[in-house]
C-alpha cells in the first residue's frame, strides 16, 4: 500500500491529519479529533533530540540514511514481528499502529515484501522522523506512544519496537494501557525490546553511548517487566518469548558485505566520534569488528549464535549479525 511521497510539516498535527485524510481515509478515521487538540502539547518526547537533524545535535539524518541505503537490513526481525499479529490483521480494513516508527521503516519493508495486508500508520515523537516518513511515502503522525491521538477501539494491531527503552521507565506501563485502549476486541499488541544484559544492551553501552553525539543511557526491559506491563494494562492473554532479530547486509563479496554492515551501524547509531577518530572507512571497519565481538550468544533453545556469511540465491554474499530480542504478545 505504498503512498505517494509528500512534504508534510513534522511539527504540525493539523497538517498531518489533513494529509492523512487525502491519502488514506481509513487511517484518518482512526484519529480522535479531541485528542488531536488536547494531546498536541504532549506530542514531543525526548527522542526529539536523539532523532533530530545533526544541526540540532541529533542523529536523525544519519539514521534515515542508514534505513534508506540498507532498507532490508532489519527485514527478518520485522517479518517476525508483523507475523505475530496473526488473524487479527487478516481482513480488508485492518490497521496497525507502529508507535516508534521513525521514518516509516516497518511500513516500507512491509510494502517491499508484502508481509501483511494491513495498512500501517507510522507514529513518532520526533518531528524530523515524521517529516522523513512522509517524504518516503509513509503516512505518519506526531505522537508519543504514551499519549496517542487515536480513537478507542479503532485499530487491529499495535507495534512497539526498536526503541521501547527510549520511553521513560515510569511511563512504559502507560504505553501498554494506551495500546489496549485503541485496540479493537481481538486486536494484538506486540512489544519488543532488547533484554537487560543482552548483546544489544552491551552494544549501546560500549559503542553507541561513548561514540555517538547523543549518548545512549536508557534502561532496557526484562522478560518479567514486559509481562508485568501487559498484565497491569488489563491484557488477559499474553506471552513473552525471544526471537533472533538480525542485521543483514548483502554485497558481491564477503568483505564488502561486512563493510556495508559497518557503514550501516555507523550511520544507524550516529557514531560520529568514531568517524572523527578513524575516518569514514576506518569507522565502518571498526564498527563491524565490534559487532563481531559483541553479538555472540546462545539462544533460548541452546543454539550458539554468531555473525556469519551466507550465499544468497542470486550469488551475492549476505552477512548476518544475530541479535536476541524479547517480544511480548498480548490479545485484547
Feature map (PLM): residue ranges:
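Class I SAM-dependent methyltransferase SAM/SAH-binding core
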Residues: 97-147
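Short alpha-helix
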Residues: 218-234
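Short catalytic micro-motifs in class I SAM-dependent methyltransferases
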Residues: 162-166
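A short glycine-rich, Lys/Arg-flanked "PGG" loop and its adjoining helix->strand segment in the class I
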Residues: 173-188
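A conserved beta-strand element that flanks and buttresses the S-adenosyl-L-methionine
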Residues: 159
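Conserved Class I S-adenosyl-L-methionine
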Residues: 5-36, 237-332
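Conserved class I S-adenosyl-L-methionine
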Residues: 2-92, 105-109, 129, 190-213
